Every structure is written in C-alpha cells, then in structure tokens.
Amino acid sequence: MKHKQRWAGAICCFVLFIVVCLFLATHMKGAFRAAGHPEIGLLFFILPGAVASFFSQRREVLKPLFGAMLAAPCSMLIMRLFFSPTRSFWQELAWLLSAVFWCALGALCFLFISSLFKPQHRKNQ
C-alpha cells in the first residue's frame, strides 16, 4: 500500500492532465478564441498540479511533474486521433509543453501555500 501511495501524485496528475486537456479540446475551443484569448485555457492546468501535489506523499513537485510529462504524449495522441487538428503538430506540442509548465507551477503554488499554513517548530535558544 505504501508503494502505491508514493505514486499517487503522479497517477493523479496523469489522469487529471488528460481530463483537462480533453475538456479544453472539446468544450472550450470556441469560447476562448471568440474572446481573443486562447491561452487562458492553459490556466486550467494549474489544477492537476495542485491536486496531485496534495496527494503526493511529502507534498512533492517532481511526482506531479512526472505525471504531466507522461500525460502530454498521451494527450497529443488522443487529440490527433479523435479530434480534427486545427493547429499544426508543432503548435500543439508547444501548447502541451506549456501545459506541463503550468501543471508544475500549480504543484509549486500548492507547496508554497501549504508551507505558509504549516506550523513552524522553532527552538527557543
């Protein structure tokens, strides 16, 4: 059980990254383009990183990053196979790599916020 808990952050990030990617590929395509800000959808990738960092064993950043890096090629394959590509391969690759960045940033933000609320144990000298 302990071995599975070590990889809970990576698995959680892998699944949530693909879910967010599919959600943005299906539902949000027209909304952000009509507003003139297609990159706003990338901010949704902060959520998988933060949630995965919460489920990581010691509130790590590397396990969510690893899960996002594994999910990016799977997401690219799913988007290429099941959706008609509207952008070139290189544009979608750049979009997915920036999504990995935002996912890691979400894990870092959660780590920062949780360190602010963690009680400090200081020795009085």
Curated annotation (Swiss-Prot):
The keyword Cell membrane applies. Pfam families: YbjM. One of its GO terms (cellular component) is plasma membrane. InterPro entries: Uncharacterised_YbjM. The chain crosses the membrane at residues 7-27, 35-55, 65-85, 93-113. It is found in: Cell inner membrane. It is a multi-pass membrane protein. Residues 1-6, 56-64, 114-125 are cytoplasmic. Keywords: Cell inner membrane, Cell membrane, Membrane, Transmembrane, Transmembrane helix. It comes from the Bacteria. Residues 28-34, 86-92 are periplasmic. The keyword Nucleotidyltransferase does not apply. This is Inner membrane protein YbjM. It comes from Escherichia coli (strain K12).
